[in-house]
């Protein structure tokens, strides 16, 4: 099921060739490394240092050089990244509590062309989607990552609403 999720995200970010993608709450870098291995420029942000060490080691072992790893909170690093470069795609896979208000604010300030939100909690997903003004759901998929349990992952592909669409 993990490969299914990664392929889905890869299809959604296909238009991001040579453009910056942020993978926020990246964990050990699964999504970031999957995309970087296909030539995409990815900046992975994760607070848990051992996970970032694993991601760096995986990148080195697999000869992946188009992925940058930032250890620290999304609240800390995302504003710094968007102040330096235009972000085409923002991928967020937050913990069950969802995104903080400051992360939503940073997302909206960066005005990426697309946002991909992966969530394990339908309640916080709904709350956060409502706060992402200026974006429209383009596709949504439910993935049963943990068969025989009540847990699901929901992947949502949002595109920026262009002024002509308003």
Report the location of each language-model feature.
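Rossmann-like S-adenosyl-L-methionine
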Residues: 1-166
């Amino acid at each position: 099921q993990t490969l299914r999720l990664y392929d889905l995200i890869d299809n959604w970010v296909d238009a991001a060739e040579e453009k910056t993608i942020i993978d926020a709450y990246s964990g050990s870098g699964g999504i970031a490394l999957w995309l970087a291995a296909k030539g995409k420029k990815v900046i992975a942000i994760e607070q848990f240092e051992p996970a970032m060490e694993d991601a760096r080691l995986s990148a080195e072992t697999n000869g992946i050089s188009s992925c940058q790893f930032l250890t620290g909170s999304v609240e800390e690093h995302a504003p710094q990244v968007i102040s330096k470069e235009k972000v085409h795609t923002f991928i967020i896979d937050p913990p069950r509590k969802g995104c903080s208000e400051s992360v939503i604010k940073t997302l909206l300030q960066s005005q990426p062309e697309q946002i991909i939100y992966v969530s394990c909690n339908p309640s916080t997903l709904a709350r956060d989607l409502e706060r992402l003004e200026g974006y429209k759901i383009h596709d949504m998929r439910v993935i049963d990552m943990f068969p025989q349990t009540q847990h699901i992952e929901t992947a949502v592909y949002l595109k920026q609403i262009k002024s002509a669409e308003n």
